[in-house]
C-alpha cells in the first residue's frame, strides 16, 4: 500500500510515546520505509531499540552520533521524507520549531524538510491551553504545518481534558491522506451514499436490509485520500465514520432523498452505494402493534427513486454512478439500469458469489459503462473503491 514511501516519525518526551511503536509497526506492515527520530527526553519513556527492531532502521537521537553513514543525516532524511509526523509533540519541541530553533536531530530534520509536516500535541490540559502554546501552534499552521487536535480524556496527570494523543488509527489516517494516493480528485466534490435505510412500521419494528455500509464507507475514504472533498450520506451502520469526511446521517429512504437531492447541485461526482428501501409502510403506527391470533398485513407504498431523480436532473458535467445488486440476469438488468437512469457507471454485484455483497470485507463486481463491461476479481472493498474511482476519472 505504501511501498516506495518514506515516513519520518518524530517522538518527544511524553508518556504517550509508546503509541508510536504501534504506529511504526502498522506503517511497516503497509510496506512504508519508516525512520524514527527521538529527543533525548523521549528515550526516558521508550527505548530506541524498540523502534529499531520494528522498523529495521537506525533510530536517531544525537545529531553528532559517530555511528552513521557518511552523509549529513538530517539533510539526507529530509530529502527522502514524503511526510513527517511529530507525535507525541511536547510543548517544548513545539516552541522550538515555532521559534526556528534546531538543536537536535529531530528539530534540524524538521527544519530541512520540504514535505508535509504534521504535529500531534500531547500534554497536560493547562499546558495545551496556555496562550503561548496556542500562539506557537497558530504560527506553525501559518507556515503550513498541520496540527492534529488532541483528544479529550483521562491524562497521565490524573486530570480529564484536552491533551491526550489520539489513537494510532487516527494518526495513521493523517499519514495516509497525505501519501497513499496521487491527488487526482483534488478540487472535486464527491457525494457517496452508504448503508441501509430503515422504514418504520411502529415505534418498535421496521423494514430494512442487510447492508452494512462497508462498500460506501470504503469509497468515501479512498475518495478523501485521493484529494476529494467528500460528503457521505449514511444510513444507520455500526462503522466508524472516515476522518476528514462530512457525514450526513439519515434513517429512511425519504431522509436520504432529501439529503442527496438538496446537495446534488454542488457535486462533481455522485456515487450511490446505499441499499435504499424500494417500499415503505403506507402508515406508521403511533403505538406498538399488538400480536393477534390472525394473519397480519402491512400496506406498502413505493419510495422515491433517488437514482432516477439524479439521472433526470444531473448536469452535463456531473458524473453519476449507481450500484446494482442482483441474484440473476446481472449484466442484462445492470445495462438496463445504466440506460434508464442516465448513469455513467453501474457497479454490478452478484450476491450469490462467495466473498461478495453485504457484511464482508471483500467484493466481486463487474463495472458496466457504455463502452462495455469489465469483471474484477475478488478484491478488498477498498481496492474495489479504487477501481471504481479510476473508472470514473478516466
Predicted regions and their residues:
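A cross-family phosphate/adenosyl-ligand binding-site feature
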Residues: 1-118, 124-213, 217-394
